């Protein structure tokens, strides 16, 4: 199916209203909003002006975005710090905002989550060879974004009993 529809272009004023609704629905990054504004057919100067305005009105707040991203990915998906940082960087979030977002993670709960994931995966892992099993568990936890030193400590604890 060919798409001959021409993307409607908006005036900066119309785009501001649409972008405000887009940001009000859920937290957005500057990068996401910038892409949306360009899709409205705006000129680069107008896009940057609207980004500044939306930021001043707190409709775009990257620190708040980072905090809610961390709460979601850590709280629901049990991602580790490394995977969360990588996800935020890919969305163009500054190092400062990433650092602020990571403060949402309770260090004690973080290790409990790691141990819980390890025990759950260990219970379902079919590999009998201890070396291969350890390697599979390590890969799994690293894919979840946990730090290798914490993984090694957790594995030692599991093996000791």
What are these regions (language model features)?
Residues 1-161:
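An alpha-helical, amphipathic repeat domain used for nucleic-acid recognition
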């Amino acid at each position: 199916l060919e798409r001959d529809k021409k993307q409607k272009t908006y005036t900066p004023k119309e785009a501001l209203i649409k972008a405000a609704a887009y940001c009000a629905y859920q937290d957005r990054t500057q990068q996401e909003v910038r892409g949306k504004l360009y899709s409205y057919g705006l000129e680069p100067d107008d896009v940057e002006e609207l980004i500044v305005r939306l930021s001043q009105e707190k409709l775009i707040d990257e620190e708040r975005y980072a905090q809610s991203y961390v709460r979601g990915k850590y709280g629901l998906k049990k991602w580790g710090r490394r995977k969360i940082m990588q996800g935020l960087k890919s969305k163009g979030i500054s190092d400062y905002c990433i650092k602020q977002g990571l403060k949402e993670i309770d260090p004690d709960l973080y290790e409990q989550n790691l141990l819980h994931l390890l025990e759950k995966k260990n219970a379902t892992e079919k590999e009998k060879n201890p070396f291969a099993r350890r390697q599979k568990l390590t890969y799994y936890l690293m894919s979840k974004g946990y730090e290798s030193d914490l993984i090694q400590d957790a594995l030692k604890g599991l093996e000791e009993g």
